[in-house]
C-alpha cells in the first residue's frame, strides 16, 4: 500500500478514511470553527484542516459523494479536483449547491471523496495529420441514447 504523508493543520481535523474494504475513495471531512451554509445556486470553499505530500507521479482527486449529490444536489463544480504532488497547502473542497434549499456543512461532515492515482506527464509531438479510426471526429452523444 502506498504511504502518503499527511499533516493535521488543525488538531480537530479528521483523517481521510476508506468506508469499506474495497472503496476506491476515502471520505474527506469538513474542519470548521462554525457551520457553513451553501445557499442554492452558490458555492463555498470548505476547509479540511489537512495538508498532504504525495509522491512524485501521483495526484489526489477530490470527487463528489454520491449520497450528497442524490439527496441534496451537492457536488464539486471542478470534479474531479486535482491536488498535484508538489502542492503543500491545505486541502480544501469547493461545494456547489444545485438544489433549492440551503445546505448546512458542519464540522466533521463527510463532504467529498479522495482518490489517489498514478499520473504520467507526456510530451506532445506535433504532426500534420492523425491516424484514422472508426469513430473519427464523432463525439458528444454521437452514439445516441438507445439501448445497449
Curated annotation (Swiss-Prot):
User: Catalytic activity annotated for this protein?
Assistant: dUTP + H2O = dUMP + diphosphate + H(+)
> What InterPro entries is this protein classified in?
dUTPase, dUTPase-like, dUTPase-like_sf, dUTPase_trimeric
What molecular function terms (GO) are annotated for this protein?
A: dUTP diphosphatase activity; magnesium ion binding
Q: Does the keyword RNA-binding apply?
A: no
Q: Could you say which cofactors this protein requires? A: Mg(2+)
Q: Which SUPFAM superfamilies match?
A: dUTPase-like
Q: What GO terms in the biological process aspect are recorded for it?
A: dUMP biosynthetic process; dUTP catabolic process
UniProt-listed CDD domains: trimeric_dUTPase
The EC designation for this entry is 3.6.1.23
> Which Pfam families does the entry link to?
dUTPase
The keyword Hydrolase belongs to this UniProt entry's keyword annotation: yes
Give residues annotated as binding substrate. Answer: 65-67, 78, 82-84, 92
The protein's UniProt keywords, in alphabetical order, are:
Hydrolase, Magnesium, Metal-binding, Nucleotide metabolism
Enzyme class, spelled out: hydrolase
Pathway(s) annotated for this protein in UniProt = Pyrimidine metabolism; dUMP biosynthesis; dUMP from dCTP (dUTP route): step 2/2
Entry-linked PANTHER family: DEOXYURIDINE 5'-TRIPHOSPHATE NUCLEOTIDOHYDROLASE
The similarity annotation says: Belongs to the dUTPase family.
* HAMAP family from the UniProt entry: dUTPase_bact
* Main function: This enzyme is involved in nucleotide metabolism: it produces dUMP, the immediate precursor of thymidine nucleotides and it decreases the intracellular concentration of dUTP so that uracil cannot be incorporated into DNA.
What is the official name of this protein in its record? Deoxyuridine 5'-triphosphate nucleotidohydrolase
What gene is this protein a product of?
A: dut
Amino acid at each position: 500500500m502506498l504511504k502518503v504523508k499527511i499533516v493535521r493543520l488543525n488538531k480537530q481535523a479528521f483523517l481521510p478514511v476508506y468506508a469499506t474494504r474495497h472503496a476506491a475513495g476515502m471520505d474527506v471531512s469538513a474542519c470548521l470553527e462554525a457551520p457553513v451554509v451553501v445557499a442554492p445556486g452558490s458555492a463555498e470553499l470548505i476547509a479540511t484542516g489537512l495538508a498532504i505530500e504525495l509522491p512524485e507521479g501521483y495526484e489526489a482527486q477530490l470527487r463528489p459523494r454520491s449520497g450528497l449529490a442524490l439527496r441534496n444536489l451537492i457536488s464539486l463544480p471542478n470534479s474531479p479536483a486535482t491536488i498535484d504532488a508538489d502542492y503543500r497547502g491545505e486541502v480544501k473542497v469547493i461545494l456547489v449547491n444545485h438544489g433549492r434549499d440551503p445546505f448546512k456543512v458542519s464540522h466533521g461532515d463527510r463532504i467529498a471523496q479522495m482518490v489517489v492515482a498514478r499520473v504520467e506527464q507526456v510530451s506532445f509531438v506535433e504532426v500534420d495529420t492523425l491516424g484514422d479510426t472508426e469513430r473519427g471526429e464523432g463525439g458528444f452523444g454521437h452514439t445516441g441514447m438507445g439501448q445497449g
